[in-house]
Structure formats: structure tokens, C-alpha cells
Amino acid sequence: MSLSKMSMSGMSGMGMGSSSNSSAATCRMSMLWNWYIHDSCFLAKSWHINTGNKFAGSIIGIFFFAVAIEGLSLVQRMFDRWIVAHSNGKTLSGPLRIFFPSSTVHVTVWQQLIRAAMYSSFYLSATILMLIVMSFNGYAILFGFVGAWIGFFLFASDTYGTPSTGTGCCESR
């Protein structure tokens, strides 16, 4: 059996817990680029795709999942801007000012916990998308990347920068 067409049932000697005598449909796994639609799996055997409709739903879901990751990134930036806008000029005093400039906004423990939770959600989501793309299914890769592209287009226009005001000390003319 070639690696490019290996099924989960053919991997019974590899500790996957399935037997080669199983009559149930199996996942077609490939370590090479593939365009499998039927009997493809993403992430786990429980995400087994055995119909065209399930595959279409999965691919559309992957697309919107990638878009949502970029949306989550926007929510993170909006929360950071909200913290800065509501900081009321709170900065550190005393010996800690040596390590943290006075222009730095310092967040409360609760704000930092929320920021950490949002970052962890972003990181987990991006990792899951990476694992889905590592199925080497061309459709999953294509729709994952197109979803990220559309998501960036929709949600990242605020990251380009701000127009120059001419007040900077080191602006080039």
C-alpha cells in the first residue's frame, strides 16, 4: 500500500486502535498533497467526511473559521485601544519607572487576564487551522488561505498606520 493512498485501517499495526477487518468506512490519510473528497478526515476520525454535502460544509466552515480568526485579532486590537482610551494617564511611579517608560499604559490584572484569554483563543484557533491545513487536502488549504485573506481584507484595514502629522522629530521629508 503506498503512503499516498493509506487508509486508517491499513495502519492497524501502528497503534491507531483500528483493525484491518473493520467493515466501517475509513479515513483516507495522505502525507502528500491530495484532493480527496469522500472518506477524508480533518483533525480526527470523528470528523470523517463521507458525502459531498459534508465536505462542502466542512470546507465552508474552514473558510469562515479562518475569517473569524482575523476577526478575533481585530477584537484584540479594539480592546487594547479601549484600555489606552480609558487609562486616564495611569503610569507607574517610583523605582519601577526605570523599567517602564511613563508613556507606557499599564493595565489592571483583570484587563491583562482578558487580553491573555483573547490571545490564547487566537493562538488556539490559529493552531487548529494549521492542523486542518496539515491534512494536505488541497481544498482545505485553498479555503483556509482564502479565508485568512478575506478576513485580513475585512478586519485589518486599521493596522496600516496613521497619516503623518508633521510633528515627529525624525520624519523624513
UniProtKB/Swiss-Prot annotation:
The keyword Membrane applies. The chain crosses the membrane at residues 55-75, 136-156. It holds the Pfam family Ctr. Keywords: Copper, Copper transport, Ion transport, Membrane, Transmembrane, Transmembrane helix, Transport. One of its GO terms (biological process) is copper ion import across plasma membrane. Residues 76-135 are cytoplasmic. It is found in: Membrane. Residues 1-54, 157-173 are extracellular. InterPro entries: Cop_transporter. GO terms for molecular function: copper ion transmembrane transporter activity. Induction: By copper deprivation, and repressed by copper sufficiency. GO terms for cellular component: fungal-type vacuole; plasma membrane. It is a multi-pass membrane protein. Its main location: membrane. Interacts with ctr4. Required for high affinity copper (probably reduced Cu I) transport into the cell. Belongs to the copper transporter (Ctr) (TC 1.A.56) family. SLC31A subfamily. This is Copper transport protein ctr5. The lineage of its organism: Eukaryota, Fungi, Dikarya, Ascomycota, Taphrinomycotina.
